[in-house]
Amino acid sequence: MLERCKLKILKGACGRVKLYIILVVIPAIVISFFVYEKEKDTIAAEHKQEASVLLNLHRNKINYLIGETMARMTSLSIAIDRPVDIKKMQSILEKTFDSEPRFSGLYFLNAKGDVTASTTELKTKVNLADRSFFIKAKETKKTVISDSYSSRITGQPIFTICVPVLDSKRNVTDYLVAAIQIDYLKNLINLLSPDVYIEVVNQDGKMIFASGQASHAEDQKPVSGYLDDISWNMKVYPNPVTIEELSKSLVLPLSCIIVLLNILFILVLYYLLKRQTQLERSENEAQKLELIGTLAASTAHEIRNPLTGISGFIQLLQKKYKGEEDQLYFSIIEQEIKRINQIVSEFLVLGKPTAEKWELNSLQDIIGEIMPIIYSEGNLYNVEVELQYLTEQPLLVKCTKDHIKQVILNVAKNGLESMPEGGKLTISLGALDKKAIIKVVDNGEGISQEMLDHIFLPFVTSKEKGTGLGLVVCKRIVLMYGGSIHIESEVRRGTEVTITLPVSAS
């Protein structure tokens, strides 16, 4: 019933569409989702790695620019002659300014903060004593780098490097101030990375400048790092994953997934169709066997009654006609009647195998009772018969004794008949996992694979005078007792028949 339910989906185009959706469409969607997420994460990780490389590149560039400017201003402050020649200082500042586009202006301040020399033309007197960088440089006597601010001289956004000029007693006499354009840093970064959004913020989180793309995703986390000499934090935002990138990376894996799922669908469909064919064939064979069994049982009863009468009349005639020739004919008639009775008995088992009463019987006793018959038959065929008991434990089976005898005798007789020129027949009895195992092995002619595939079908036989019902009846009996029968054979090598029966507790 379960197999039928499973195979209903194969009926009609609708069923196959459902199967295709179950095996291909749904798995493809689920797998594609995970592949999509994985590829997206992979590309995002690559972008983050690229952002880290750019961060190090730009940070090192700005660190070098600031460090090189500090070194230049420090060297200039040391090289200043005393007393200071303002015109000469003006000339030095202008030459330095003209050689570097980074500067917004270079200034020389006296101790009071007045601008005494400048690269920018001053219309009025300018004093920078109120600037925080001037105050700090005056207090610490060390180079100070300011935060960004708007220049009161040029109006440009700048940051300054203020270097105090010390005399021999380490007193501050003057100051060198280099104003660096914020736009220069922005253009420098934008030139190298125009497609990447980069922010530079101070320690308070105030934006100094931004370059690259105009915006970034709100949930996008930047790669960041502080500059060495100034408390600015540079943030590089990885580029978002684009549809074009995902499309290129997903074409191959998704194509492979779809191809593999379609192959799986074809294989499953083939398997289910094969199972459906086998199921239909099994149902047909079962129906045929049931029909044959019903017909055989009813026919057997009809045949057995007149056979009994014929047998009785033959016995009367045997007593009346004592002639040697007459007795010969009577014996032949009796043999044929016995053969007909045997066939009728097989018909009855085939039709109603459950009619007998089941009892607990020892397999050792059953085999022991039929071995004289098998030994006798073996002598007729010039075959050596060997019996092996592989266990000393009594093997009790709930069954009808005659049925088990019939199975073993039938299988043994088949083995003997397969060795017309002599050979060896081995019958063994053993136990495994609460099951009795009976093996009948011969080294006769063997059975072809084609015949083995149909060996348990009614009326299939390789014998000239066989009915083709013997093994059918044997299998019916064994299955009736919850056992199994299996045949392995190789042409010109022999045959092994294995019968398993469930063992009952004593």
Curated annotation (Swiss-Prot):
Q: Which UniProt keywords apply?
A: ATP-binding, Cell membrane, Kinase, Membrane, Nucleotide-binding, Phosphoprotein, Sporulation, Transferase, Transmembrane, Transmembrane helix, Two-component regulatory system
Its main subcellular localisation, reduced to a broad class, is membrane
| Cellular component aspect of the GO annotation | plasma membrane
The UniProt disruption phenotype note reads: Cells lacking this gene sporulate normally in spo0F mutants.
Record-listed E.C. numbers: 2.7.13.3
The top EC class is transferase
Which residues carry the post-translational modification Phosphohistidine, per the record?
H301
GO BP, one annotated term = sporulation resulting in formation of a cellular spore
Q: Which reaction does it catalyse?
A: ATP + protein L-histidine = ADP + protein N-phospho-L-histidine
State the superkingdom. Answer: Bacteria
Membrane topology of the entry: Multi-pass membrane protein
Q: What does this protein do?
A: Phosphorylates the sporulation-regulatory protein spo0F and, to a minor extent, is responsible for heterogeneous expression of spo0A during logarithmical growth. Also phosphorylates spo0A under biofilm growth conditions.
Spell out the protein name for this chain.
Sporulation kinase D
- Recorded source organism is Bacillus subtilis (strain 168)
Please name the gene that encodes this protein. Answer: kinD
